[in-house]
Amino acid sequence: MSDYPSCALRLEQVARRYRSGDQELVVLDHADLELRPGEIVALVAPSGTGKSTLLHLAGLLEKPDEGRVWIGSHDAGGLSDTARTALRRDHLGFVYQFHHLLGEFSALENVVLPQMIAGRTRRQAEQHALTLLSAFGLQHRASHLPGMLSGGEQQRVAIARALANGPAVLLADEPTGNLDIHTAETVFSALLSAVRNQNVAALIATHNPDLAGRMDRQVTIREGQIVPA
């Protein structure tokens, strides 16, 4: 493994186990993974092999039983819950299969809110949100509520929201899994363009081999190890 300053995300000898009755299920067994700044990696693990667990560990939503998770030069091990939340807010972005937009807020407001939580003024946040929405071709939909948007538009707003605070790492779990083929292609192309333009490292789970093939490399989970796909 490389020294951490050169990595946007680093999982070092990470182990995660769960108990089911009297049995212990080993999901990750001292596994390693690193993403360099701007690197886009496809996670193509089948369902049930630990894909969600890996994303949760990388996103600081779960703690490993053993090993360390680094976000840039920050070691997440031993941090308080408050410090982990701040690290996640300031350095990570998340995109899910379902957009999880706040239905009572407009597209613009959904992208503004995380910025204001991070400390930007409303004016700064709105200007940046409009820039992001414009990059996704949504400037004319900024005032619309999520329910007034198409599925593809909703997901593009969700991606803009994930990138609003300038994360070092984007974690995406089947970001096009709920879309038809044509819309999925449009959304995925927009996602790739955005992360490349911002030099964001990305770990993107997908079952679509065509989309996976457009990323820099592919990994899977096999017998508790993260290995090339």
Curated annotation (Swiss-Prot):
Domain of life: Bacteria
Residues that, per the record, bind ATP: 45-52
Keywords assigned by UniProt, alphabetized: ATP-binding, Cell inner membrane, Cell membrane, Membrane, Nucleotide-binding, Translocase, Transport
CDD domains reported in the protein's UniProt record: ABC_MJ0796_LolCDE_FtsE
Topology in membrane: Peripheral membrane protein
Pfam families in UniProt: ABC_tran (PF00005)
GO biological process: lipoprotein localization to outer membrane; protein localization to outer membrane
Principal location class: membrane
GO terms of molecular function: ATP binding; ATP hydrolysis activity; transmembrane transporter activity
Subcellular location per the Swiss-Prot or TrEMBL entry: Cell inner membrane
UniProt EC number: 7.6.2.-
Residue stretches making up the ABC transporter domain: 9-229
InterPro entries hit by this protein: AAA+_ATPase, ABC_transporter-like_ATP-bd, ABC_transporter-like_CS, ABC_transpr_LolD-like, MacB-like_ATP-bd, P-loop_NTPase
One cellular-component annotation, GO: plasma membrane
Subunit structure and binding partners: The complex is composed of two ATP-binding proteins (LolD) and two transmembrane proteins (LolC and LolE).
Function noted in UniProt: Part of the ABC transporter complex LolCDE involved in the translocation of mature outer membrane-directed lipoproteins, from the inner membrane to the periplasmic chaperone, LolA. Responsible for the formation of the LolA-lipoprotein complex in an ATP-dependent manner.
Family: Belongs to the ABC transporter superfamily. Lipoprotein translocase (TC 3.A.1.125) family.
Protein name: Lipoprotein-releasing system ATP-binding protein LolD
